[in-house]
C-alpha cells in the first residue's frame, strides 16, 4: 500500500518504512506526527481524493531536524565593475520515517498533526457571533425616521432627553435654543408632529 501526501507545498509518494526529507516541521526528534493531507491511497483498491481523501492520514516518526545541502548564489558584474557577491543558503528540513498509512479513522488516532515551523495548529472554527440588536428603551421612538437624523444625531437627541416624537413636537423656539448637545432643525419639529399623530 502506498499514499501520496502533501506537505510543505510538495507532494510525496510514500510507503511504510520510507525515509523522507520534508520542509521543517514543528516537532522534536522521536515524536510521532500525522500528515492529514493525503491526496491518494494506492493498493488493491485505490482511492483518489477530491482534493484530499477524507479520514486518511500518514503517520511518521521524526528522526531529526537537519539542514539541506548548501546552495551558493554568486553574482558578478563584468568588465570595469569589480563587484562580486556570494550568498549561501541551507534549507531547514525534517527527516521523518513513515510508520503507518491509515486509510480511515485518522481523526480518532490522537496523533499530533504535522505543521510547519511557525504555523499555528488548525483550531476549530468558532461559530460567528450574531450581533445582538440594541434593545430600544421602553416608550421611545425611532428618531432616525426624521429626515437628516442618523444614528449619531439620534444618540445626541437621546442624551438631551428627547426620546419620542411627541417630545420633539412639543419643543418651542426657546427650548430649541436652550439645547446645546445638538442643533435641532425646525423641519424635525414639523416631521415629529406628523409622526406623533401616526
Swiss-Prot record:
Sorted alphabetically, the keyword list is: Ribonucleoprotein, Ribosomal protein, RNA-binding, rRNA-binding
Coiled coil feature spans: none
Q: Which SUPFAM superfamilies match?
A: L21p-like (SSF141091), Rad51 N-terminal domain-like (SSF47794)
UniProt signal peptide: none
Q: Which domain of life is it from?
A: Bacteria
Q: Which InterPro entries match?
A: bL21-like, bL21-like_sf, DNA_repair_Rad51/TF_NusA_a-hlx, Ribosomal_bL21
Give the GO molecular function terms.
Answer: nucleotide binding; rRNA binding; structural constituent of ribosome
Question: Which BP terms does GO give this entry?
Answer: translation
* Family stated for the protein in its record: Belongs to the bacterial ribosomal protein bL21 family.
Q: What is this protein called?
A: Large ribosomal subunit protein bL21
Which organism is this protein's natural source? Ruegeria sp. (strain TM1040) (Silicibacter sp.)
Upper classification of the source organism reads: Bacteria, Pseudomonadati, Pseudomonadota, Alphaproteobacteria, Rhodobacterales
Amino acid at each position: 500500500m502506498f499514499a501520496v501526501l502533501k506537505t510543505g507545498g510538495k507532494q510525496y509518494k510514500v510507503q511504510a518504512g520510507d525515509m523522507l526529507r520534508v520542509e521543517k516541521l514543528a516537532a522534536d526528534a522521536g515524536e510521532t506526527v500525522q500528515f492529514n493531507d493525503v491526496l491518494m491511497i494506492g493498493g488493491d483498491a485505490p482511492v483518489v481524493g477530491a482534493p484530499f481523501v477524507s479520514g486518511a492520514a500518514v503517520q511518521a516518526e521524526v528522526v531529526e531536524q537537519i539542514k539541506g545541502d548548501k546552495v551558493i548564489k554568486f553574482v558578478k558584474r563584468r568588465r570595469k565593475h569589480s563587484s562580486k557577491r556570494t550568498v549561501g543558503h541551507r534549507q531547514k528540513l525534517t527527516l521523518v520515517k513513515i510508520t503507518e498509512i491509515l486509510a480511515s479513522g485518522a481523526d480518532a488516532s490522537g496523533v499530533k498533526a504535522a505543521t510547519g515551523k511557525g504555523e499555528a495548529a488548525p483550531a476549530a472554527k468558532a461559530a460567528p457571533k450574531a450581533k445582538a440588536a440594541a434593545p430600544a428603551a421602553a416608550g421611545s421612538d425611532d428618531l432616525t425616521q426624521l429626515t437628516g437624523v442618523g444614528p449619531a444625531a439620534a444618540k445626541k437627541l437621546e442624551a438631551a432627553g428627547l426620546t419620542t416624537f411627541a417630545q420633539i413636537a412639543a419643543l418651542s423656539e426657546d427650548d430649541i435654543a436652550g439645547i446645546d448637545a445638538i442643533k435641532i432643525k425646525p423641519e424635525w419639529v414639523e416631521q415629529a408632529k406628523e409622526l406623533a399623530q401616526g
